[in-house]
């Protein structure tokens, strides 16, 4: 018998690198999307931490009145934020090398634009990386599809809305109180609470929380016991076991009797599709609503919809909300303009008797 030995071809460094990047045996999968994701998210995180701690005040409204957002300039964890890029910059691309000096870049809020751009690219690549790993493992692509909902929401808040409003200064500040300020101003200017797509998003988030709690409690309550009464039921589960770990028939029967038969799923695949789709579709609609309101296609307006036979207005809840909106609009950017647009564009009512 003759043995033929062939010399193995030397693998190039590039091929070795490609194999390492795309290997599913790594403790953390990198992937080609990860090559972009990792430096982007590291950059965004590093600059955010530094700016949150030490960034000097930013002239957010472009009127030479800087607003302090960092911890070293008098804020705490609640009030601190990375202040959005100045209204004087608008939508211009504003990297460090476009400013005359580092001090000017910081004064005009350059870190905000740097963080947002790297963050959005990073989370988009994270979504692509989810798809890439699923593809290499032979899985279906729906994990990445589900993650597209928060990616769409973040993109709407940090990119689409500033584009529609004409300035990055209208983006959401990167902080706790800054987030709430953004929400209040958004309600004042766009009446988001009366927008059907926002309502769908609320139903998606709260409904998803309810369904998640219901599903988790039902599964935990219908585990198939593999242990004695003296041991934890959890000890009877072995990772990767072929047998089912809970009795879906028992869970279905319980829930069907609690409400009614057809309110309960008897198909595990349909159930888990529903659990995924409900919040995802709701958040998709919210992101779409934010993106339309960015261009001032606002929530429904029912102000002064009800009048009596004499033509006098009978106030409804819509009128109460409108009064609150005007109050919030008066309070924000108080030095950037004399009157809110809603008040400045309407002729003052007569005060004659």
UniProtKB/Swiss-Prot annotation:
Localisation per UniProt entry: Plastid, Chloroplast thylakoid membrane
A matching Pfam family: Photo_RC
EC number(s) given by UniProt: 1.10.3.9
Coiled-coil portions: none
Residue span(s) of the pro-peptide: 345-353
Positions that bind a quinone: 215, 264-265
Protein's membrane topology: Multi-pass membrane protein
Assembly: PSII is composed of 1 copy each of membrane proteins PsbA, PsbB, PsbC, PsbD, PsbE, PsbF, PsbH, PsbI, PsbJ, PsbK, PsbL, PsbM, PsbT, PsbX, PsbY, PsbZ, Psb30/Ycf12, at least 3 peripheral proteins of the oxygen-evolving complex and a large number of cofactors. It forms dimeric complexes.
Family indicated by similarity: Belongs to the reaction center PufL/M/PsbA/D family.
Protein's name in the database: Photosystem II protein D1
Organism: Oltmannsiellopsis viridis
Higher taxonomy: Eukaryota, Viridiplantae, Chlorophyta, Ulvophyceae, Oltmannsiellopsidales
Gene that encodes it: psbA
